[in-house]
């Protein structure tokens, strides 16, 4: 049995059922806790160099 072709109206109505409402689209996102935020420490490399230099001086 051949599959019946869906009408354009049927497809549009099907898509409209799952459109989010204005409220859910514009709902503000909750602010994450400080511990949940992942940041990249840009100065970590500089601190490592400084620490290694200081350690090298102590071992002499």
UniProtKB/Swiss-Prot annotation:
Pfam families: NinE (PF05322). It comes from the Viruses. Belongs to the ninE family. This is Protein ninE. It comes from Escherichia phage lambda.
């Amino acid at each position: 049995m051949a599959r019946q072709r869906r009408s354009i109206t049927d497809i549009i109505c099907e898509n409209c059922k799952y459109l989010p409402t204005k409220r859910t689209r514009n709902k503000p996102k909750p602010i994450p806790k400080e511990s949940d935020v992942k940041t990249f420490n840009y100065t970590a490399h500089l601190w490592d160099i400084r620490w290694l230099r200081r350690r090298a001086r102590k071992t002499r």
